[in-house]
Every structure is written in C-alpha cells, then in structure tokens.
Amino acid sequence: MKNLSFPLLFLFFLVPELLGSSMPLCPIDEAIDKKIKQDFNSLFPNAIKNIGLNCWTVSSRGKLASCPEGTAVLSCSCGSACGSWDIREEKVCHCQCARIDWTAARCCKLQVAS
C-alpha cells in the first residue's frame, strides 16, 4: 500500500487542477500565481516589453516595390494573379511573373513605445 500512496495523492490532488476548475482560486493560490507572474515578467527587461512592430504597405507599378531605409520586407503581393515573388536585399519585393502591373511590399520596423 505504501507504493501506491504517492500516485494516489497525485491523482487525487493534482489531476483535478490540471483539468481545470470552475471555483475561484483561494488566497494562497492567488498569491502563488501572482508571484509566478512577477518572476516570469522580471526575466524580461522593460525595454523588451515596450518593443512593437510597426508595419505598412508600399505599392508601385511594375515588378519591384521597395521599402524605405530602416525597414524590412515581411511579405509581398503581385498583380496579374502572380504568386511567385522573392525578397531582394531585405527591402525590395520582386514579382517573378511576366507582365506584372503592380507589386506591393509589406514593410515593417521595430518601434519602441514610450
């Protein structure tokens, strides 16, 4: 019976918690949860928490669309139902089909919130 006591305790106490509970947390559980979140958040410097991604679309006629300096291309779109494109030098979208009427580049840069 001694060999079964630990597995039974595990099943009796921990498994219901893993399955979820509709009951609110008791004050001790809330305190533990709060401490875990604080410790987890302290792993990341505040500067990292305030970094975001600022994106917009640049389009042009023809098969090339360029993003401004300081930004990078994340994706491209091509006119004339062309789905074949590549990114050149991290800032230029190039549509590879013949007779492309327009090309669009999704340009993004990191932005630090104040």
Swiss-Prot record:
Q: Which CDD domains match?
A: RELM
Q: Which residues cross the membrane?
A: none
Q: Where in the cell is it found?
A: Secreted
Disulfide-bonded cysteine pairs: these are 55-108, 67-107, 76-93, 78-95, 82-97
Q: List GO molecular-function terms, semicolon-separated.
A: hormone activity
Tissues of expression? Expressed in white but not brown adipose tissue in a variety of organs.
Q: Which InterPro entries match?
A: RELM (IPR009714), Resistin-like_sf (IPR036262)
- Magnesium as a keyword? no
Q: Which UniProt keywords apply?
A: Diabetes mellitus, Disulfide bond, Hormone, Obesity, Secreted, Signal
- GO CC list: extracellular region; extracellular space
Q: Where is the signal peptide?
A: 1-20
What interactions and quaternary structure are annotated? Answer: Homodimer; disulfide-linked.
Q: What does this protein do?
A: Hormone that seems to suppress insulin ability to stimulate glucose uptake into adipose cells. Potentially links obesity to diabetes.
The family classification in the record reads: Belongs to the resistin/FIZZ family.
Protein name according to UniProt: Resistin
Species of the source: Mus musculus
